[in-house]
Amino acid sequence: NADTPLPPASMSKLMTLYMAFEAVADGRLRIDETLPVSAAAAAYGGSSMFLDTTDRVTVEDLLRGVIILSGNDASAVLAEALSLDGTEAGFARMMTARARQLGMVNSTFKNSNGWPDPEHLMSMRDLGILADRLLTDFPTYYPLFSERSFAFDGRVPANSQNRNPILGLGIGADGFKTGYTDQAGYGIVGSAKQGDRRIIFVLSGMDSSQQRAEEAEKIINWAFRQFAQKQVVDAGTIVATADVWMGDLPSVGLTVENDLSLLVPLIGTANGVTAEVVYTGPIAAPVTKGQQLGEMVITLNGLPESRLPLVADRDVAKGGFNMRLRTAALVLWEKFAPLTPLPSLPSLPDAPSDAPS
């Protein structure tokens, strides 16, 4: 079940990375800024950068330490720097709140790195949402996930290799993150690109690192053989119109701002794509061009639905007094005489929009 909360192990570090990338983007952190290492961060065992309390480490090195070395200590250093109260626990609460804003409704964080805790849980769907947002929101940093090694200042040379087993297999794999604990088993959030097609997948609960590597490779090969990219909607397409209440126009077009393409099965898709426009109307004037007014919900043969924002294709100002009177009359007529043909209303010169009403 993709929505069942499970122990995510180190895959939850992707949330710490997302929030660190946000902090760099909005200026709360600088990529060349150095951060201190607390005793609590240095005390972490497991996968590590082997930091100690005498270190001051750049944000860039810490990001590589989390991505490539899966450093529990590096995650904690970033967490303490970003937390409002300077603690990892405080940062974990921020992670949970931010996850909700991103639509990750089945994730709860108790630390920055996936250290075992019975209440630290993520669903596989939430991990997929997070991976997609990392790729979409921070493409500049995505190449870090495909780096094969990182020897932080030469210490512990044996601990310098990326743990992602699908990198370098020649199948287009270029991210994201592995994870392992006794409770979680072996897992991976992975991504691969071949041509203009990209897939993101999540595996959890594997019995061994070898099984994880084999299953991840199988998924990539299967996905690119069995699925094709299909353009569903072109940017700028008006897919529906919505009635406007008290506007200087009776309706407004609902359009999509970005292309939408889906990976669809090569077999059995002839009539499998359906789309539904969802909005609450009539829309009250004024309406601003680009204002989100609804969603288009796309379903494909029982696969998870995709939702695309629908925005206004133009500005619609408030109508003048006569236009508002005409609109009210039409609504009242439709409410109280729905079966009677509506008579033609005479055209009236519209009053200025600032006329008293």
Locate each region found by the language model.
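Active-site-adjacent loops and short helices of periplasmic peptidoglycan-processing enzymes
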Residues: N1-F138
